[in-house]
């Protein structure tokens, strides 16, 4: 008998003032997998991610994470981390302060914060940049700070919304490899939104093809 999926979206729907956001979204995600939601702008992939994150609540359907019904749970109660297209860094804080900000909010002891930060900076290749502000970093370095912040959160589920779209083509290829290696090394489950077919095909174990607010096809890169 196979293990239960780590994440389940069961017939989820979202509408705004009667307008369709997503409809009939049903998806099982295995623990430790890398799942890409792929499709053009407006297809519902970011809405699906926001529903999973708890940033929006569905009008219909259920959402489960680790077997727990989180359909109406706040984002802070879903045990996940997020990496955004905009990086969402605090410009007045240093790299180190940005990385451990969430840990400070959660009142994690200082020694533990420092240990987790050192490990995250090592993994993301940011050692030596601890005191720099985001404005002093390249786009690729800023994205690595956002990744380091997700790593120190220590969550087993990480949601990524078009995290590479602000980078140039050469950097995208480099950071793409970094993200995939991190996911494998840490054994985390990643749900990754992108409109870039190459990105999805090169990173994901499973691709969810979306159009007009609905899932069109689900399969491995080879199957699609």
Label every model-predicted segment:
Residues 38-40:
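The feature captures the beta-strand-to-loop junction immediately N-terminal to the Walker
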Residues 69, 100, 104, 111-129, ...:
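Conserved ABC ATPase "signature" region
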Residues 93-101:
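Short coil-to-helix segment of the ABC ATPase nucleotide-binding domain corresponding to the Q-loop/switch region
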Residues 133-137, 141-143:
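Conserved ABC ATPase signature
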Residues 152-156:
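A short, proline-enriched helix->beta-strand linker immediately N-terminal to the Walker B motif
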Residues 218-219:
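ABC ATPase "signature
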């Amino acid at each position: 008998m196979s293990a239960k999926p780590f994440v389940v979206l069961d017939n989820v729907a979202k509408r705004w003032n009667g307008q369709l956001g997503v409809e009939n979204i049903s998806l099982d995600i295995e623990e430790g997998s890398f799942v890409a939601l792929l499709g053009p702008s407006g297809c519902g992939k970011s809405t699906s991610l926001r529903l999973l994150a708890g940033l929006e609540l569905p009008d219909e359907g259920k959402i489960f994470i680790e077997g727990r019904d989180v359909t109406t749970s706040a984002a802070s109660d879903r045990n996940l981390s997020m990496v955004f297209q905009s990086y969402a860094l605090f410009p007045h804080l240093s790299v180190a302060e940005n990385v451990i900000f969430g840990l400070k909010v959660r009142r994690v002891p200082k020694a533990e914060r420092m240990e987790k930060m050192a490990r995250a900076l090592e993994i993301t290749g940011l050692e030596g940049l601890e005191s720099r502000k985001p404005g002093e970093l390249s786009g690729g370095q800023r994205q690595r700070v956002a990744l380091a912040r997700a790593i120190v959160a220590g969550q087993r589920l990480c949601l990524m919304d078009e995290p590479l779209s602000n980078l140039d083509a050469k950097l995208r290829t480099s950071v793409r490899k970094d993200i995939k290696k991190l996911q494998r090394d840490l054994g985390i489950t990643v749900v990754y939104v992108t409109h870039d077919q190459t990105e999805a095909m090169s990173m994901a174990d499973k691709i969810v093809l979306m159009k007009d607010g609905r899932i069109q096809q689900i399969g491995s890169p080879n199957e699609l």
